[in-house]
Amino acid sequence: MSYSVSAAQLWSRKLAMQAEDMQQHQKSQSNQIASCLAEMNTKQEVVNQTIGQLGRSISEVQQQNSQLVLQSLNQINMSMQQVALGIQDYASRINKLEQTMSDMNLKFEALQKEQNSNTKTLADCTSQMTIITKKLDAELKKRYMTTKQTRTVQNQTMPRSNTTTKKRVLAIDFLADDDY
């Protein structure tokens, strides 16, 4: 029996060694699983942090984009208002300019009518002056002829100078022009 005890001992030792090997194997597998789980947890935390950072970044970018869009829309709105005001100002200036032009056209037409009437008046005055000048010339010739024919002997000895006669003719013309 000692052989069988020894076989039983061997067998129990073998089983104990196998159990110990299995325990160590399970322990190493448990350690590997624990380290794998720890690594997965750390990686999950990194992923969660990255996802959180990405989420925050996305929300920040969305906020910035929405702010930029709002600012751009406000600037466009202000620009449109300025353009509208500019157009209104331009339209009022054009209206004033058109009004000024129509006023100037009316004044120009009035000036043309006045000029036409003045031209007619001037033409009438010129024709009247021509008639008056012809009459005066005729009267002067008559006077000159009568004065020459009725000269006395004393006057004939002292002939008049040309300048005195010219002065008299100019004086008569001057008086005729002023309607004296």
UniProtKB/Swiss-Prot annotation:
GO terms for biological process: reciprocal meiotic recombination. GO terms for cellular component: chromosome; nucleus. Keywords: Chromosome, Meiosis, Nucleus. Disruption phenotype: Abolishes localization of hop1 to DNA double-strand break (DSB) hotspots. It is found in: Nucleus; Chromosome. Coiled coil: none annotated. It comes from the Eukaryota. Disulfide bonds: none annotated. Homomer. Interacts (via C-terminus) with hop1 (via C-terminus); the interaction is direct. Interacts (via C-terminus) with rec10; the interaction is direct. Interacts with mde2; the interaction is direct. Required during the early stages of meiosis for meiotic recombination. This is Meiotic recombination protein rec15.
